[in-house]
């Protein structure tokens, strides 16, 4: 308020002048006349127009009421009421205290797959394990229940599968398979060339195929090894096959087996059978493979074991000789009569006459300085 303001009250109540919290009591007659009003207290100005009437003077109301509108920033309101000019009672309404939530510390790192209450936090459905628990409980309750065997089931190995075909198939499994290409020149015998190649090593040889032309072929009967028919001309090799296996009873170069061939003549006739001799008309290439089967592999292992056993006894004396001390070497040489590099025999000295034992001793004593040295002296 600037200066003072006049507030009129209905009825016979007096009018008050407000100036910064200071109230002045005036009668209605004084307010109406405006002339007989007592002088204002020092520091207060009189009203410029005393005939101003407050519009609320005609309306009956409470003796005194002041209200402030609720501010948007405050959640409470202030009400002031006065039944009389001397009674003023302010009322305050405080808002309820806000509820505090517990502080939760943020966890760092990768989220856990399983939360502490047992639920899956990543949305993964757990595997049902009821059947496994039931099986375990049944096996624990029943001690006579058969236990599950560990390892490979019996009868599923390679040897067991080969045993169904017979003992020969079980022992003839090849090892160290190696392919070969045999070249046969013009005019050479293909059979003799392949047989000599198989005799170089104690390995079985299997003929896979052959390509080229031949000028002469000698066929033999199946039941005998002697040739029976001979064909001459130019023939194309259609197929060539056979094998040479090592004969253990006949030696390392003894072989069992043979070759068979199918040839096509110039007119389209096909001849073939077991061959005794096959002469090449041009370069012929034979594809073969060699391998070591069970019998020869066992013999090779036995030979290696015997060789190792022979080598070990020879190495033991050398180790014992290296352990002898150098101080005992001269005494051992003198006791056994071994000749050192400085002790030469009398027979080896040609040109020196040997008449008796005395001259021989003098020669030995002059040549061997070890006899004059006393090893016990310092």
From Swiss-Prot:
<feature type="short sequence motif" description="Bipartite nuclear localization signal">
    <location>
        <begin position="105"/>
        <end position="113"/>
    </location>
</feature>
<keyword id="KW-0539">Nucleus</keyword>
<feature type="region of interest" description="Disordered">
    <location>
        <begin position="30"/>
        <end position="70"/>
    </location>
</feature>
<comment type="subunit">
    <text>Interacts with AHL29.</text>
</comment>
<dbReference type="GO" id="GO:0005634">
    <property type="term" value="C:nucleus"/>
</dbReference>
<feature type="DNA-binding region" description="A.T hook 2">
    <location>
        <begin position="147"/>
        <end position="159"/>
    </location>
</feature>
<feature type="compositionally biased region" description="Polar residues">
    <location>
        <begin position="335"/>
        <end position="345"/>
    </location>
</feature>
<feature type="region of interest" description="Disordered">
    <location>
        <begin position="302"/>
        <end position="378"/>
    </location>
</feature>
<keyword id="KW-0805">Transcription regulation</keyword>
<dbReference type="InterPro" id="IPR017956">
    <property type="entry name" value="AT_hook_DNA-bd_motif"/>
</dbReference>
<feature type="DNA-binding region" description="A.T hook 1">
    <location>
        <begin position="105"/>
        <end position="117"/>
    </location>
</feature>
<dbReference type="InterPro" id="IPR039605">
    <property type="entry name" value="AHL"/>
</dbReference>
<dbReference type="GO" id="GO:0003680">
    <property type="term" value="F:minor groove of adenine-thymine-rich DNA binding"/>
</dbReference>
<protein>
    <recommendedName>
        <fullName>AT-hook motif nuclear-localized protein 5</fullName>
    </recommendedName>
</protein>
<feature type="region of interest" description="Disordered">
    <location>
        <begin position="88"/>
        <end position="160"/>
    </location>
</feature>
<keyword id="KW-0804">Transcription</keyword>
<feature type="compositionally biased region" description="Basic residues">
    <location>
        <begin position="104"/>
        <end position="113"/>
    </location>
</feature>
<feature type="compositionally biased region" description="Polar residues">
    <location>
        <begin position="316"/>
        <end position="327"/>
    </location>
</feature>
<feature type="domain" description="PPC">
    <location>
        <begin position="171"/>
        <end position="314"/>
    </location>
</feature>
<comment type="function">
    <text>Transcription factor that specifically binds AT-rich DNA sequences related to the nuclear matrix attachment regions (MARs).</text>
</comment>
<dbReference type="Pfam" id="PF03479">
    <property type="entry name" value="PCC"/>
</dbReference>
<keyword id="KW-0238">DNA-binding</keyword>
<keyword id="KW-0677">Repeat</keyword>
<dbReference type="InterPro" id="IPR005175">
    <property type="entry name" value="PPC_dom"/>
</dbReference>
């Amino acid at each position: 308020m600037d200066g003072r303001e006049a507030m009129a009250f209905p009825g016979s109540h007096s009018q008050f002048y407000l100036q910064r919290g200071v109230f002045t009591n005036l009668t209605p007659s004084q307010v109406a006349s405006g002339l007989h009003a007592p002088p204002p207290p020092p520091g207060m100005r009189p009203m410029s127009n005393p005939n101003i009437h407050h519009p609320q003077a005609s309306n009956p109301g409470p003796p005194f009421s002041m209200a402030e509108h609720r501010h948007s920033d405050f959640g409470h309101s202030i009400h002031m009421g006065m039944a009389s000019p001397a009674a003023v009672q302010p009322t305050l309404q405080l808002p309820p205290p806000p509820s505090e939530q517990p502080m939760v510390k943020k966890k760092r790192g990768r989220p856990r797959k399983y939360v502490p209450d047992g639920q899956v936090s990543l949305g993964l459905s757990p595997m049902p394990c009821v059947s496994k628990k039931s099986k375990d409980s049944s096996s624990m309750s029943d001690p006579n229940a058969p236990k599950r065997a560990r390892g490979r089931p019996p009868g599923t190995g390679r040897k067991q599968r080969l045993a169904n075909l017979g003992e020969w198939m079980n022992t003839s499994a090849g090892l160290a398979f190696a392919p070969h290409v045999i070249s046969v020149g013009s005019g050479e015998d293909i059979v003799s060339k392949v047989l000599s190649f198989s005799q170089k090593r104690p390995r079985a040889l299997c003929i896979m195929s052959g390509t080229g032309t031949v000028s002469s072929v000698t066929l033999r009967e199946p039941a005998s090894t002697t040739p029976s028919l001979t064909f001459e001309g130019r023939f194309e090799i259609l197929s060539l096959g056979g094998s040479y296996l090592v004969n253990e009873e006949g030696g390392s170069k003894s072989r069992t087996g043979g070759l068979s061939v199918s040839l096509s003549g110039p007119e389209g006739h096909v001849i073939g059978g077991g061959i005794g001799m096959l002469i090449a008309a041009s370069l012929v290439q034979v594809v073969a493979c060699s391998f070591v089967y069970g019998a020869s592999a066992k013999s090779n292992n036995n030979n290696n074991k015997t060789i190792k056993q022979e080598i070990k006894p020879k190495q033991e004396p050398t180790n014992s000789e290296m352990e002898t001390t150098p101080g005992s070497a001269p005494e051992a040489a003198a006791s056994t009569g071994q000749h050192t590099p400085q002790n030469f025999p009398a027979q080896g000295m040609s040109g020196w006459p040997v008449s008796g034992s005395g001259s021989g001793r003098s020669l030995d004593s002059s040549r061997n300085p070890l006899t004059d040295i006393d090893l016990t002296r310092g």
